[in-house]
Amino acid sequence: MKTLGEFIVEKQHEFSHATGELTALLSAIKLGAKIIHRDINKAGLVDILGASGAENVQGEVQQKLDLFANEKLKAALRARDIVAGIASEEEDEIVVFEGCEHAKYVVLMDPLDGSSNIDVNVSVGTIFSIYRRVTPVGTAVTEEDFLQPGNKQVAAGYVVYGSSTMLVYTTGCGVHAFTYDPSLGVFCLCQERMRYPEKGSTYSINEGNYIKFPNGVKKYIKFCQEEDTPTQRPYTSRYIGSLVADFHRNLLKGGIYLYPSTASHPDGKLRLLYECNPMAFLAEQAGGKASDGKERILDITPESLHQRRSFFVGNNHMVEDVERLIREYPDA
């Protein structure tokens, strides 16, 4: 049995900027995940369920657990003196860590994806993305350090809190998964170099918004529902409403996750920096593909911290089918 800590140290030589700091950074995220795991498991017993009464910068009502997870992860990263600053879905602006100007890395995160599902005991997750800063080491980080295209990520991953808690990450050398053993207090390696199955047969989308979708996406949904033996259609529809949970299932079973633009969200709804980029990095490392329907997610240069984007991620052939239909059936 190999622990996450042992595995990271063992694979450190594969990382082009190996200094030991990235190992410590991932350990800090691991600690934060353990704390969140502990409190999610007793969420119904303490007063951390429901809405907090506050709103984030996007105008969304923050759940109590959103704020709790954000503070715990922020504290875990700040305590190690290895991160110069963070950007979070729950913070209006970047958070500069004073006294950490010497640090080489910045972290972007969605502390608790799918938190509205907590009240009904459905899987949620944490998403993280790590970059090397671009401003000089020794100075305070600026927004420039965070507004980098996804192809500059040095590591990314997620934690899914479900029937078991799993941490999945990549440093650009494959995707690896670890299951948390609460009796030992450690994450243990359960899957190394994860890959999408050759063919996917599941599509994940909120079909309740069908009437609002672009024409190409509507055509793709119909394509998924058609009977066609050579392509093993119709596909199965599975949608949890938690990006981490839907992505994780499709990675294991084969499938595509779709969150297109709508009339009310013409640029898409998912955040490019906190959700799309890290999941796109993981998908490509697992042999999949991620697109906004027209271009590769990882090649998009962000313009703002909370920028949104349409998002299609999963098996190559499924994402390519969506892109093809979006091209063939443009909106008027």
Swiss-Prot record:
Essential cofactor(s): Mg(2+)
Signal peptide span per the entry?
A: none
Example GO BP: fructose metabolic process
Subcellular location per UniProt equals: Cytoplasm
Protein name listed in UniProt: Fructose-1,6-bisphosphatase class 1
Q: Name one GO molecular function term.
A: fructose 1,6-bisphosphate 1-phosphatase activity
Q: Which UniProt keywords apply?
A: Carbohydrate metabolism, Cytoplasm, Hydrolase, Magnesium, Metal-binding
Q: Which GO terms describe its cellular component?
A: cytosol
Q: Where does it primarily localize?
A: cytoplasm
Q: Which organism is it from?
A: Enterobacter sp. (strain 638)
Q: Where does substrate bind?
A: D113, G114, S115, S116, N206, Y239, Y257, L258, Y259, K269
Cross-referenced InterPro entries, in alphabetical order?
FBPase_C_dom, FBPase_class-1, FBPase_N, FBPtase, Fructose_bisphosphatase_AS
Q: Where does Mg(2+) 2 bind?
A: D110, D113, E275
Q: Which CDD domains match?
A: FBPase (cd00354)
Q: Per its UniProt record, what Pfam families does this chain match?
A: FBPase (PF00316), FBPase_C (PF18913)
Question: Cross-referenced HAMAP family, in alphabetical order?
Answer: FBPase_class1
Residues annotated to bind Mg(2+) 1:
E89, D110, L112
E.C. number(s) listed in UniProt: 3.1.3.11
Could you tell me which SUPFAM superfamilies the record lists for this protein?
Carbohydrate phosphatase
Q: Which reaction does it catalyse?
A: beta-D-fructose 1,6-bisphosphate + H2O = beta-D-fructose 6-phosphate + phosphate
| Family listed | Belongs to the FBPase class 1 family.
Cofactor binding, note field: Binds 2 magnesium ions per subunit.
- Quote the pathway field: Carbohydrate biosynthesis; gluconeogenesis
User: Subunit comment for this entry?
Assistant: Homotetramer.
